[in-house]
Regions:
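A short acidic, Gly/Pro-enriched loop at the edge of an enzyme's catalytic core
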Residues: 20, 80-91
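A short SAM/SAH-binding and catalytic strip from SAM-dependent methyltransferases
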Residues: 89-103
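Conserved beta-strand signature within the Rossmann-like core of class I S-adenosyl-L-methionine
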Residues: 117-125
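A short glycine-rich, Lys/Arg-flanked "PGG" loop and its adjoining helix->strand segment in the class I
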Residues: 104-116
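Short alpha-helix
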Residues: 136-151
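Class I SAM-dependent methyltransferase SAM/SAH-binding core
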Residues: 23, 29-81
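Conserved alpha-helix/loop element of class I SAM-dependent methyltransferases that forms part
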Residues: 1-21, 35
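Core SAM-dependent methyltransferase catalytic element
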Residues: 161-181
Length: 181
């Protein structure tokens, strides 16, 4: 996939928002951080979180070259640690949730990092069959069932692309519950 593919995959999850405070969890070299910076524009701010310092450094160079007005803070951390972020307007997590074996604990933390009514964009392989590179696979059907238990009030599919690994990749948008009305 290229930058245009990344933007198209998450665009519907960001539509209607300009600016705001977002995070990209498990951001790696920043493919979706760049897409988020492109979609949010200069009014947005992004916290890019990954445990690989070299990947974050590479990402910072790309962001400076392609989106010099983007406000991005790189945070080197393990996603299972308490993160000094939030509450955010939205979080993107692309091809990273499948590395987390304690998914329920993590999702409880994740929902606390998002404002009520905030957005969570998940990009994952559409498979429940893992392998060494995708150890805890999470298909769209499994995520859809898991999202409500995790505290999201609404979850919908926003994109899908073919993948040479595990068939396809999906993007979904989940909105955090806003509490009783």
């Amino acid at each position: 996939m290229n930058h245009g593919d990344h933007v198209r995959l998450i665009r519907d999850g960001v539509l209607g928002l300009t600016g705001g405070e977002w995070a990209d969890l498990g951001s790696g070299t920043g493919a979706f951080t760049l897409a988020l910076a492109d979609l949010l524009g200069p009014g947005g701010s992004i916290v890019s979180v990954d445990r690989d310092g070299d990947a974050l450094a590479s990402q910072a160079r790309l962001l400076t070259a392609r989106f010099p007005s983007a406000s991005v803070r790189c945070l080197r951390a393990d996603l299972m640690d308490e993160l000094a972020i939030g509450p955010m307007d939205g979080i993107v997590m692309a091809n990273a949730l499948h590395f987390i074996c304690e998914r329920e604990l993590f999702l409880t933390r994740l929902t606390s990092w998002i404002r009520p009514g905030g957005r969570f964009i998940l990009v994952e392989y559409d498979s429940d069959r893992g392998n060494p590179w995708v150890p805890h696979a999470l298909s769209w059907d499994t995520w859809h069932a898991t999202a409500e238990r995790a505290g999201f009030g609404e979850t919908r599919l926003i994109g899908r692309v073919p993948s040479r690994f595990l068939g396809s990749i999906y993007a979904s948008l989940s909105v955090t519950s806003v509490g009783p009305s």
